[in-house]
Amino acid sequence: MKKITLALSAVCLLFTLNHSANALVSSPSTLNPGTNVAKLAEQAPVHWVSVAQIENSLTGRPPMAVGFDIDDTVLFSSPGFWRGKKTYSPDSDDYLKNPAFWEKMNNGWDEFSIPKEVARQLIDMHVRRGDSIYFVTGRSQTKTETVSKTLADNFHIPAANMNPVIFAGDKPGQNTKVQWLQEKNMRIFYGDSDNDITAARDCGIRGIRILRAANSTYKPLPQAGAFGEEVIVNSEY
């Protein structure tokens, strides 16, 4: 009788352990949630384009004026903005209204900015075409600036193609870039922000989105493609 009892106990223990093991295997894990083919295939309906496709779309067209935003479009300039915030207003964005910050940012701090690879490709393409290149930024204007030289040097822009940076500034309720796009008769404008795309649309020209890097200090990140605009693939760097 004792042997039978021990045998039954062993069977029960084995069943319990096996059930526990199966439960561990089959229970969903919050640490490793997994995925499926449907989720992997899901994509936002965005009009993606490459630099090569943009160049091809311009085949046969004469040289034109094209424009670029600066911050997060051609330069990853977060290091300067990060330093500005820590120096002038650690607990707020008030540093963006401080002329002392803009004097620093526009006169040397872009030496810490990283040129974006997508900008190199685009600017090289437009230089080959003989296009006139403008940079229109929302930065505040300062008495002096070295941004124009920094951009010309970083992207090897010939003097014949390069124009001085336009500091459009920032005015509440107003898209300050519109008048410059119109005045310089730009036909394409590249930018990372919604304001860049809407400025181009307000002027009836082609606005092309460049992705803002995920680690940019400029948050929140915009919804690229939200206006049905072209968005350049792999343009976050």
Swiss-Prot record:
It catalyses: a phosphate monoester + H2O = an alcohol + phosphate. It is an enzyme of class 3 (hydrolase). GO terms for cellular component: outer membrane-bounded periplasmic space. It is found in: Periplasm. Its cofactor is Mg(2+). NCBIfam families: AphA (TIGR01672). Homotetramer. This is Class B acid phosphatase.
